[in-house]
Amino acid sequence: MGQQPAKSMDVRRIEGGEILLNQLAGRMIPKGAVTWSGKYPTIDHLLDHVQTMEEINTLQQQGAWPAGAGRRVGLTNPTPQEIPQPQWTPEEDQKAREAFRRYQEERPPETTTIPPSSTPPWKLQPGDDPLLESKSLLETHPLYQNPEPAVPVIKTPPLKKKMSGTFGGILAGLIGLLVSFFLLIKILEILRKLDWWWISLSSPKGKMQCAFQDTGAQISPHYAGSCPWGCPGFLWTYLRLFIIFLLILLVAAGLLYLTDNGSTILGKLQWASVSALFSSISSLLPSDQKSLVALMFGLLLIWMTSSSATQTLVTLTQLATLSALFFKN
C-alpha cells in the first residue's frame, strides 16, 4: 500500500541530468543587485558564467551528457543511439540474386503494343472532313444540337401595353402632387396660426402692427406675422415659422424616444380600453385596400376644404383610423 514502482536506469539518468543542469543554470542567472546603477554585471557574475559554460563543454566533450537532458538548454544529445544497419552474408546475397533472376525469367512478356501512328496528310479537302464544311464545332456536335420538342409550343405575340396603365400612373402622380401641394399650404397655415398666437402672447392687443413698416419701405400698413415681400420683417416671420417647425419636430422626436424606452403616453393610460377602442374601429373598417384608400382620401379632402373645428374632428378621425389599421396589422 502506497508503494510506487521502481524507476528504470534511463529515467534516473534523465532526472539526474535535469537536476545537474538546474544547479548549473542557477549559477549563471545573476541574483541580487548587479551594480549600483543596475546596468552592467560585476566581474564575479562574469567569472561564474564562464566557469559554468566550461563545465558544460567538458561534460559534452567527455560524452557524459545524460540522455534526454539536452532539452533544458536546447542542445542535442551528443551521443545519440545509432540505428543498427542490416548485415548480409554472402550466402544470403547470392540467394537473393538467384530469386530475382528466376522472377525475371518466369514473368510473362508484355503483349500490349502501341500501333504505329500514321502520318496525317498536310492538306485536307472539304469533302474529307465534315468539320471543314460546318461553320463551327457546336453545329456538328450531337450534344449541342437542338432536339425537337416533344410537346408543341404555341408562340403568342407579345402583349401591347395598354394606355390605361400609363394614364393611371400619370393620374396617380398628379394626385400625389396635388395632395402634397395642399398639405404644404395647410402646414404653412398651421404654422402661421401658431406664429400669430406667439405674437399675441408677447405683444399687447392694441399694438399688433408690424414694427418694420416705419423704416422707410414703401409698403402698406399690416400686422406682425403677415409681412409682404419687401418688408424687413418678412425674413423674421419665416425665421419664426422655421423655429416653430423645429420645435414641433423636437417634440415628435421626444415622443418617439419615449416610445422606444417603454414610457409612452399609451402606457400610462389604460391599455385595455385603448385596445378595445382600436379593435372596434378596425372591425368597422372595410377590408378592401381600395376602399381604405378612398376613405382616407375623402377625409383628406374634407380636412383641406373645411373650417378649423371641422378640421380638428377630421384630424382626430384620421388618427383613429390610422391607429386602428396599425393595430389590425
UniProtKB/Swiss-Prot annotation:
Its main location: virion. A lipid is attached at G2 (N-myristoyl glycine). Residues 2-164, 259-291 are extracellular. It comes from the Viruses. Residues 92-109 have a biased composition (Basic and acidic residues). The record marks L239, R240 as: Cleavage. Glycans are attached at N261. Residues 76-88 have a biased composition (Polar residues). The keyword Transmembrane applies. Residues 61-129 are annotated as: Disordered. The chain crosses the membrane at residues 165-185, 238-258, 292-312. Myristoylation contributes importantly to DHBV infectivity. It is most likely required for an early step of the life cycle involving the entry or uncoating of virus particles. Phosphorylated on pre-S domain for about 50% of L proteins, the L chains with internal pre-S region (Li-HBsAg). InterPro entries: HBV_HBSAG. GO terms for biological process: membrane fusion involved in viral entry into host cell; symbiont entry into host cell; virion attachment to host cell. Pfam families: vMSA (PF00695). Keywords: Fusion of virus membrane with host membrane, Glycoprotein, Host-virus interaction, Lipoprotein, Membrane, Myristate, Phosphoprotein, Transmembrane, Transmembrane helix, Viral attachment to host cell, Viral envelope protein, Viral penetration into host cytoplasm, Virion, Virus entry into host cell. Residues 2-162 are annotated as: Pre-S. Residues 2-237, 186-237, 313-329 are cytoplasmic. Large internal envelope protein interacts with capsid protein. The large envelope protein is synthesized with the pre-S region at the cytosolic side of the endoplasmic reticulum and, hence will be within the virion after budding. Therefore the pre-S region is not N-glycosylated. Later a post-translational translocation of N-terminal pre-S and TM1 domains occur in about 50% of proteins at the virion surface. These molecules change their topology by an unknown mechanism, resulting in exposure of pre-S region at virion surface. Belongs to the avihepadnavirus major surface antigen family. This is Large envelope protein. It comes from Duck hepatitis B virus (strain China). The lineage of its organism: Viruses, Riboviria, Pararnavirae, Artverviricota, Revtraviricetes.
